[in-house]
C-alpha cells in the first residue's frame, strides 16, 4: 500500500483530503489540493504545467490528469530522460478543476483544461476542452450530455456550517 509524491515540496494539500493507495502525484511546477477532496486508488496527476483542484472534488479510480504532454507529431523528442531543450513542442498548461466536480473512473484530462464548477465527467471519457459549469460530460472526446442540478449547494452550506462548528469547538 502506497501513494507516491514526486517533488513533494511543489504539492500543497488542504483540510479533509484523502489520497488512496496506488496514486502518484508528480509536483512539476505545482499541484494544489484545496479542501474536502477524495482521490481514489490508481489516480495519476502530472503537474508539469500546474494542477489546481478546488473544494469538494471527487476523483474516481484510474483517472489521469495531465498538465504536460509530449508532442506526438515527430517534431520533438520525448520521454522524461530527454532535456526540454530537445522538446520544442512540449505542451504545458495548467489544469483547473472547479468546486464540486465529480470525475468518473478511467477519465483522462489533457493539459490546459478547466472543469467548471459542478461538472460531472462520465467514466472513461477523454476531456480535451473546458467544461461548462453544472454540466454532465461523457465520451471520447467528452461532449456535453445534460445539465446538473445545483441542489447540492444548499447541502454544501449546511455541511460547512456543521464542519466549521466542529473544528472551532
Where are these regions (language model features)?
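Flexible, glycine/small-residue-enriched loop-and-beta-strand segment within the central core
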Residues: 2-13, 18-111, 140, 148-149
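Acidic/histidine-enriched, glycine/proline-rich intrinsically disordered or flexible terminal extensions
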Residues: 155-169
